[in-house]
């Protein structure tokens, strides 16, 4: 997906470039991640999809078309991704973190849903009443994006773009100490040099530190966390741990 809707060939060029830069950084640091892919991207970028799988990362569903979400995407994207990858798709994230039917996700056999940013961002995310950390809805594990305790400051991609890295890393460390884990997400287009393309008409907070700057920031974040001894894992690996914890019988 891209920040603003673009013709398919332009969007694919940006997304493929950015995905490869992310993969380079992960490979350099020896860590695994989860790639939430639209079926549209998977069908049009087979070489990148193969690289994602060959390098040991998880593929999860992200709908079909990022700009035209449909209720049927929950089933269609899973079916398409499983056909293309030969893997069971366990996770789902709705494009733009919009609401999605947990009942339908559970019916389709998903293990987890990561479509919630429990932050308070007027006009975007208004989720102060939602849990900050993992919880269950039926048999489906909910994995919200991490926000800080108390004020729920979001630590997603936009914060990493614009906060001083010392401050961003300090907030990440605070969440890790408080919650025991940290969940964040980025987009491939953030790793494309958006500042070199005024025709995209991106606002400053979006293009700030894009391209090489985001490569350096992601690398810095990973190295900082590894130096502190924190392990990295895919969402499916994390889900198995949390499900075991949440489903553990109460001790009498």
Region locations from a protein language model:
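Metal-dependent polysaccharide deacetylase catalytic core of the NodB/CE4 family, i.e.
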Residues: 23, 27-101, 107-116, 122, ...
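C-terminal domain-boundary segment and adjacent tail
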Residues: 18, 27-30, 165-252
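Alpha-helical scaffold elements lining the catalytic groove of polysaccharide deacetylases
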Residues: 65-84, 131-180
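The substrate-binding groove and active-site-proximal loops of carbohydrate-active enzymes
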Residues: 7-13, 37-38, 61-68, 89-90, ...
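Short catalytic helix/loop segments, enriched in acidic residues and glycine
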Residues: 5-24
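Soluble, non-transmembrane catalytic domains of enzymes that act on hydrophobic metabolites at membranes
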Residues: 106, 124-137
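Aromatic/hydrophobic pocket-lining residues that form the small-molecule binding cavity
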Residues: 15, 19, 45, 70, ...
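Short, small-residue-biased leader/transition segments that mark boundaries at the very start
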Residues: 1-3
């Amino acid at each position: 997906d891209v920040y603003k809707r673009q013709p398919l060939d332009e969007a694919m060029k940006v997304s493929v470039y950015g995905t490869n830069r992310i993969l380079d950084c992960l490979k350099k640091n020896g860590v695994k991640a989860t790639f939430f892919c639209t079926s549209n991207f998977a069908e049009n970028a087979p070489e990148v999809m193969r690289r994602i799988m060959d390098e040991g990362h998880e593929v999860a569903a992200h709908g079909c078309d990022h700009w035209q979400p449909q209720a049927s995407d929950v089933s269609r994207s899973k079916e398409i991704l499983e056909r293309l990858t030969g893997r069971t798709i366990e996770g789902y994230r709705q494009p733009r973190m919009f609401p999605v039917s947990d009942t339908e996700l559970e019916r389709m056999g998903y293990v987890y849903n990561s479509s919630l940013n429990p932050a308070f961002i007027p006009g975007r995310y208004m989720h102060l009443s939602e849990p900050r950390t993992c919880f269950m809805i039926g048999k489906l594990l909910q994995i919200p994006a991490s926000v800080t305790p108390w004020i729920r400051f979001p630590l997603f991609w936009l914060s990493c773009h614009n906060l001083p890295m010392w401050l961003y890393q300090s907030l990440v460390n605070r969440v890790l100490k408080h919650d025991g884990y940290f969940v964040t997400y980025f987009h491939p287009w953030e790793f494309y040099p958006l500042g070199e393309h005024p025709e995209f008409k991106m606002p400053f907070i979006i293009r700030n530190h894009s391209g090489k700057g985001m490569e350096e920031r992601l690398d810095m974040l990973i190295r900082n966390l590894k130096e502190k001894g924190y392990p990295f894992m895919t969402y499916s690996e994390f889900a198995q741990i949390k499900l075991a914890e949440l489903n553990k019988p109460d001790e009498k």
